[in-house]
């Protein structure tokens, strides 16, 4: 097992042990949503808030300028329950599931598999589209990304940190063979996601019927962000 695999397993085991603790003094840490958070982070922060409200679990939102540096893996949002830290939509959903709270008890195994496939498609494909536009498209980076990401820092950090973050994201895109894609090709990928989700939704109220699941929370987070982004 690789070192990253060992670390992932250790974190998973720790969360499994900590899932038994009471749901008390719970805070959700996010970047400044109106001024700092980028599209994909805003979407995930909104998705987690939506999911937790669906489960009726109480929590407080705390906006901080340096959440991605506080986060153990740089992923936001960051859920803090007592001394336990959980980062990102999927990990937070899994942690809540381990506490016996789920939105999928009414679903069949096939529907649960479809729901997880939807989450994977949104997380891995749509989020990658958003990162490409924000960090790889020069005009968007100069006019939007750099300004928002650096808005909470003083110079020279306001220039240095966006540059460092851009280099990291571009490496991620390169690892996925997205670095050579055109904007038209990226748009086609986004259209693929929207068509697939639209076909599944059909005339239903939610993706899997009359009741919402975590996939609906995640979809809402991204769609609301895409529709309202300026």
Curated annotation (Swiss-Prot):
Its main location: mitochondrion. It is found in: Mitochondrion outer membrane. Keywords: Membrane, Mitochondrion, Mitochondrion outer membrane, Protein transport, Transport. InterPro entries: Glutathione-S-Trfase_C_sf (IPR036282), Metaxin_GST (IPR033468), Mito_Protein_Transport_Metaxin (IPR050931), Sam37/metaxin_N (IPR019564). It comes from the Eukaryota. One of its GO terms (biological process) is protein transport. The keyword Transmembrane does not apply. Disruption phenotype: Knockout animals show abnormal mitochondrial morphology. Mutant worms display developmental delay, with almost none reaching the young adult state. Pfam families: GST_C_6 (PF17171), Tom37 (PF10568). GO terms for cellular component: cytoplasm; mitochondrion; SAM complex. Associates with the mitochondrial contact site and cristae organizing system (MICOS) complex (also known as MINOS or MitOS complex). Involved in transport of proteins into the mitochondrion. Belongs to the metaxin family. This is Metaxin-2 homolog. The gene is mtx-2.
């Amino acid at each position: 097992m690789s070192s990253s695999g060992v670390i992932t397993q250790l974190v998973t085991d720790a969360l499994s042990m900590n899932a038994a603790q009471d749901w008390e003094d719970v805070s959700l840490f996010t970047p400044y949503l109106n001024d700092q958070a980028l599209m994909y982070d805003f979407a995930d922060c909104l998705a987690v808030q939506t999911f937790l409200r669906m489960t009726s679990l109480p929590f407080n939102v705390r906006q901080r300028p340096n959440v991605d540096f506080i986060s153990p893996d740089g992923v936001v949002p960051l859920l803090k329950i007592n001394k336990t830290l959980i980062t990102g939509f999927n990990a937070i959903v899994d942690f809540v599931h381990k506490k016996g709270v789920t939105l999928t008890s009414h679903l069949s195994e096939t529907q649960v598999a479809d729901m997880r496939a939807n989450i994977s498609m949104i997380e891995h494909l749509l989020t990658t589209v958003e990162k490409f536009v924000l960090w790889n498209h020069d005009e968007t980076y100069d006019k939007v990304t750099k300004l928002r990401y650096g808005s909470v820092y003083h110079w020279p950090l306001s220039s240095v940190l966006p540059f460092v973050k851009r280099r990291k994201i571009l490496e991620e895109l390169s690892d996925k063979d997205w670095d050579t894609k055109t904007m038209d090709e990226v748009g086609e990928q986004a259209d693929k996601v929207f068509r697939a989700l639209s076909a599944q939704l059909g005339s239903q109220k939610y993706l899997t019927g009359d009741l919402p699941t975590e996939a609906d929370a995640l979809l809402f987070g991204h769609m609301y962000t895409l529709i309202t982004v300026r």
